[in-house]
Amino acid sequence: MTQTGKSNIEAKAFARYITMSPYKVRRIVDQIRGRSYEEALMILQFMPYRACNPVLKVLYSAAANAKHNLGLNKSELSISEVKVDQGPVMKRFQPRAQGRGYPIRKPTCHISLTVKGLK
């Protein structure tokens, strides 16, 4: 919970260590940045990408934080900041023929979302 200035009140939510490439999640996040809460929900629910699910969970969490901690109405919220950072990369090996092993990289990412409401 952050209060900046007189009229902007912000609530934040985070998702860490999501097993997905940050590049793929940024493609989704760029579509909802700066939009209203309800508009972002519509966009995320109808996009056909797997990365929409964790972003949708973070958006629900940020809206719940704004309602519970700050007493804001969900219809008055807008997304002020969304950030996707790279997390640690899990390194695995895939066994191959003749005793070889091919490396597999499993990237992770951290999603941070901030919603603001005007009181």
From Swiss-Prot:
Gene3D superfamilies: Ribosomal protein L22/L17. The keyword RNA-binding applies. It comes from the Eukaryota. GO terms for molecular function: rRNA binding; structural constituent of ribosome. PROSITE patterns: RIBOSOMAL_L22 (PS00464). Pfam families: Ribosomal_L22 (PF00237). It is found in: Plastid, Chloroplast. One of its GO terms (biological process) is translation. Keywords: Chloroplast, Plastid, Ribonucleoprotein, Ribosomal protein, RNA-binding, rRNA-binding. InterPro entries: Ribosomal_uL22 (IPR001063), Ribosomal_uL22_bac/chlpt-type (IPR005727), Ribosomal_uL22_bac/org-type (IPR047867), Ribosomal_uL22_CS (IPR018260), Ribosomal_uL22_sf (IPR036394). One of its GO terms (cellular component) is chloroplast. SUPFAM superfamilies: Ribosomal protein L22. This protein binds specifically to 23S rRNA. The globular domain of the protein is located near the polypeptide exit tunnel on the outside of the subunit, while an extended beta-hairpin is found that lines the wall of the exit tunnel in the center of the 70S ribosome. Part of the 50S ribosomal subunit. PANTHER family: CHLOROPLAST 50S RIBOSOMAL PROTEIN L22-RELATED, LARGE RIBOSOMAL SUBUNIT PROTEIN UL22M. HAMAP family: Ribosomal_uL22_B. Belongs to the universal ribosomal protein uL22 family. This is Large ribosomal subunit protein uL22c. It comes from Chlorokybus atmophyticus (Soil alga).
